[in-house]
């Protein structure tokens, strides 16, 4: 679990489809909160975790080809984890490893100029490699929950069959 300096959750697993591509579960929850269905306090599978704190056996890393260097900054971890999952392995989140993470402190945010252009290119690459439909169907996330927010709230629109 990664925490912001203000003791709120920055990352507790990645849900693909959040925000249209991928997002962090329970973002901004209190560090001592149990989360939706006790998920902040439970060891569980996720589609991805952030590379800010990711451990992987070298054998698996090599088997899937490591991190794709064409993702210079964003989504290299999501792409890597999806390839690990596609190879038949699981991506595990544990609440028992807790670190503070100053997200984007050293590089800034991807909101304007070249940083935004790079982010948009990397997002398009993620969708190209894993398909938009594939990203929107996270097997570890309830389809009745919203993809608009990272708080596990209910979806306002019923999913289409």
Label for each model-derived stretch:
Residues 1-64, 78, 87, 98-110, ...:
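Acidic/His-rich active-site region of diverse nucleotide-sugar glycosyltransferases
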Residues 126, 132, 136-146, 151-156:
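Long, domain-scale regions corresponding to catalytic signaling modules most often appended to membrane systems
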Residues 111-137:
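Catalytic core of nucleotide-sugar-dependent glycosyltransferases
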Residues 73-74:
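A short, glycine-/small-residue-rich helix N-cap motif at loop->alpha-helix starts
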Residues 90:
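Residue-level detector of anion-binding/catalytic polar loops
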């Amino acid at each position: 679990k990664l925490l912001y300096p203000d003791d709120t959750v920055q990352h507790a697993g990645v849900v693909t489809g959040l925000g249209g591509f991928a997002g962090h579960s329970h973002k901004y929850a209190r560090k001592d909160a149990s989360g939706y269905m006790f998920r902040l306090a439970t060891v569980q599978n996720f589609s991805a975790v952030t590379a800010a704190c990711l451990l992987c056996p070298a054998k698996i890393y090599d088997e899937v080809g490591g991190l794709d260097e064409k993702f210079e900054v964003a989504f290299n971890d999501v792409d890597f984890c999806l390839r690990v999952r596609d190879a038949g392995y699981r991506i595990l989140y544990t609440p028992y490893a807790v670190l503070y993470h100053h997200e984007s402190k050293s590089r800034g945010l991807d909101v304007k100029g070249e940083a935004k252009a790079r982010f948009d290119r990397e997002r398009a690459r993620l969708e190209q490699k894993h398909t938009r439909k594939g990203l929107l169907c996270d097997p570890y996330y309830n389809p009745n929950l919203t993809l608009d927010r990272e708080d596990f709230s209910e979806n306002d629109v019923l999913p289409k069959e």
